[in-house]
């Protein structure tokens, strides 16, 4: 009789552990998915910010300004001759 109770008790503990293990496993899975989604949202926000900086109507404006600063004194000197 004691053996039967011991086996039933161990079976009860095993079932309880299995249910709690599945719950813990599911909770960990949900947390990981939640963290991944939050990271993706942050990265997409960063990408949106970068695209706003890159989306310029005149993307080579800085190069033209640099070129113009280098050429302007030569034009001014040519006009004085």
From Swiss-Prot:
Q: What is the role of this chain?
A: Antimicrobial peptide with a broad-spectrum antimicrobial activity. Keeps its antibacterial activity under a wide range of salt concentrations that mimic physiological conditions of human blood, which is surprising, since Hydra is an obligate freshwater animal with nearly no salt tolerance. Does not affect red blood cells.
Q: Which residues form the signal peptide?
A: 1-18
The family line of this record is: Belongs to the arminin family.
Protein name, entry field: Arminin 2a
Give the organism the record lists. Hydra vulgaris
Looking at the keywords, is Signal present? yes
Entry GO CC: extracellular region
* Upper classification of the organism: Eukaryota, Metazoa, Cnidaria, Hydrozoa, Hydroidolina
What keywords are assigned to this protein?
Amidation, Antibiotic, Antimicrobial, Immunity, Innate immunity, Membrane, Secreted, Signal, Target cell membrane, Target membrane
Q: Where in the cell is it found?
A: Secreted; Target cell membrane
Q: Which residues form the propeptide?
A: 19-57
The record's tissue-specificity note reads: Expressed in entodermal epithelium along the body column.
PTM-bearing positions, type Alanine amide: 78
